Swiss-Prot record:
<keyword id="KW-0368">Histidine biosynthesis</keyword>
<dbReference type="GO" id="GO:0005737">
    <property type="term" value="C:cytoplasm"/>
</dbReference>
<dbReference type="InterPro" id="IPR006062">
    <property type="entry name" value="His_biosynth"/>
</dbReference>
<comment type="pathway">
    <text>Amino-acid biosynthesis; L-histidine biosynthesis; L-histidine from 5-phospho-alpha-D-ribose 1-diphosphate: step 4/9.</text>
</comment>
<protein>
    <recommendedName>
        <fullName>1-(5-phosphoribosyl)-5-[(5-phosphoribosylamino)methylideneamino] imidazole-4-carboxamide isomerase</fullName>
        <ecNumber>5.3.1.16</ecNumber>
    </recommendedName>
</protein>
<dbReference type="Pfam" id="PF00977">
    <property type="entry name" value="His_biosynth"/>
</dbReference>
<dbReference type="InterPro" id="IPR044524">
    <property type="entry name" value="Isoase_HisA-like"/>
</dbReference>
<dbReference type="InterPro" id="IPR006063">
    <property type="entry name" value="HisA_bact_arch"/>
</dbReference>
<comment type="similarity">
    <text>Belongs to the HisA/HisF family.</text>
</comment>
<feature type="active site" description="Proton acceptor">
    <location>
        <position position="8"/>
    </location>
</feature>
<dbReference type="InterPro" id="IPR023016">
    <property type="entry name" value="Isoase_HisA-like_bact"/>
</dbReference>
<feature type="active site" description="Proton donor">
    <location>
        <position position="129"/>
    </location>
</feature>
<dbReference type="InterPro" id="IPR011060">
    <property type="entry name" value="RibuloseP-bd_barrel"/>
</dbReference>
<keyword id="KW-0963">Cytoplasm</keyword>
<dbReference type="GO" id="GO:0000105">
    <property type="term" value="P:L-histidine biosynthetic process"/>
</dbReference>
<dbReference type="GO" id="GO:0003949">
    <property type="term" value="F:1-(5-phosphoribosyl)-5-[(5-phosphoribosylamino)methylideneamino]imidazole-4-carboxamide isomerase activity"/>
</dbReference>
<keyword id="KW-0028">Amino-acid biosynthesis</keyword>
């Protein structure tokens, strides 16, 4: 099981949003690169980095900072936010990002998404961000009108390497993972599935762990909980290693 600590970047700072709302922001550090190193030092095997400015604007906004984070770390980085053309994808991969998370393009520009998967095999994943069962785009501010069932077969056929499932209703709310929705999605996915939204305590990690042994669930992204201290990342990593 992999726990992915989240480093969300907005205005050059490390922040967390509640339910993706830009007006519900908490700043946790003025130095995202130092924060990324801290999570690596705590035992993280991967980092989950989101360019929130890019997600809202549709173009990269923190490229140099993200390049520096990748250069500083010895663990791989997965990155999302504002990746909406091939040139941006290539630039980030060349800068040291291990794999890319595509959201808006995957739903709105299927031909471009398929081309990204073909051009960078094994390195392109999709973020399915659901609120009330409907998928959101453009930094979670637009309703696509689509559901997971509508889009998943096409995304898998295109060559999706991994799937991140965000339950927006639980994002930043620290209410536990939506295990039933995750289990249903994993049953439809032959590629790794990563849960996002709701991981708040070691109990949530323990509840999710069995699913990583019996399904395609690879792990979970954790954000607010490790910043506020309701989840001790180092202790969680040690618990996983002991299983």
């Amino acid at each position: 099981m992999i726990l992915f600590p989240a480093v969300d970047i907005k205005d050059g700072r490390c922040v967390r949003l509640r339910q993706g709302r830009a007006d519900a922001e908490t700043v946790f550090s003025d130095d995202p690169a130092a924060m990324a190193r801290h999570w690596q030092d705590q035992g993280a095997k991967w980092l989950h980095v989101i360019d929130l400015d890019g997600a809202f604007s549709g173009m990269p906004a923190n490229f140099e900072l993200i390049r520096r984070i990748c250069a500083d770390l010895s663990v791989p980085v997965q990155l999302g936010g504002g990746i909406r053309d091939e040139a941006t994808a290539k630039a980030y991969l060349d800068a040291g990002v291990e794999r890319l998370i595509i959201g808006t393009v995957a739903l709105e520009e299927p031909d471009l998404y398929a081309r990204l998967c073909a051009t960078f095999p094994g390195r392109i994943g999709v973020s399915l961000d659901a609120e009330g069962g409907r998928l959101k785009t453009k930094g979670w501010v637009a309703d696509s009108g689509l559901t997971v069932d509508d889009v998943l077969p096409r995304l898998l056929a295109a060559g999706t390497a991994f799937v991140i499932y965000t339950d927006i209703d639980r994002d930043g709310m620290q209410t536990g993972v939506n295990l039933s929705a995750l289990e249903r999605l994993a049953g439809m996915c032959p590629v790794p599935v990563i849960a996002a939204g709701g991981v708040a305590t070691l109990e949530d990690v323990r509840a999710l762990y069995p699913m990583t042994l019996t399904s395609s669930v690879e792990g979970a992204i954790t954000g607010r909980a490790i910043y506020t201290g309701t989840l001790d990342l180092h202790a969680a990593m040690e618990w996983i290693a002991a299983q």
